[in-house]
């Protein structure tokens, strides 16, 4: 099955198929290839999640795509941006993608105080899940 076929599978088609261990093992190499692709191009995963919602109005700008790719490809990223660049939003989205694509990953965020950090992350997660409902289904 080609990547194009995997991406074009509608949620209705997926619901009709019972997922068994046999079925997963049969296509395991394809899933690994798809996950490796999304690790290099996390913005494409966001595009895929957005395509699942017919009423989607969210899209990434070029510089946001670039920032997400940098976050996923490099261990340490230092960036300075102007006001209203969506720094917190993109950072939290990057952390969420890292947790989705690297199960068991330990991630953290830093702010002036513990409560402030928790408040920022919580509000951004809520905002992301409102804009991209498929991301909410990834949270346990």
Predicted regions and their residues:
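Phosphate/NTP-binding elements of NTP-utilizing enzymes
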Residues: 2-140
């Amino acid at each position: 099955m080609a990547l194009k076929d995997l991406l074009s599978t509608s949620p209705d088609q997926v619901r009709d198929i019972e997922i068994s261990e046999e079925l997963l093992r049969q296509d395991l190499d394809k899933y690994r290839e798809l996950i490796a692709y999304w690790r290099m191009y996390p913005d494409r995963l966001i595009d895929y999640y957005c395509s699942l919602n017919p009423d989607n109005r969210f899209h990434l700008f070029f510089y946001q795509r670039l920032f997400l790719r940098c976050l996923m490809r490099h261990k340490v990223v230092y960036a300075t941006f102007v006001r209203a660049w969506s720094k917190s939003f993109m950072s939290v989205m990057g952390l969420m993608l890292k947790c989705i694509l690297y199960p068991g990953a330990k991630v953290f965020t830093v702010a002036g105080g513990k409560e402030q950090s928790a408040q920022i992350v919580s509000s951004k997660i809520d905002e992301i899940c409102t804009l991209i409902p498929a991301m909410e289904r990834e949270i346990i």
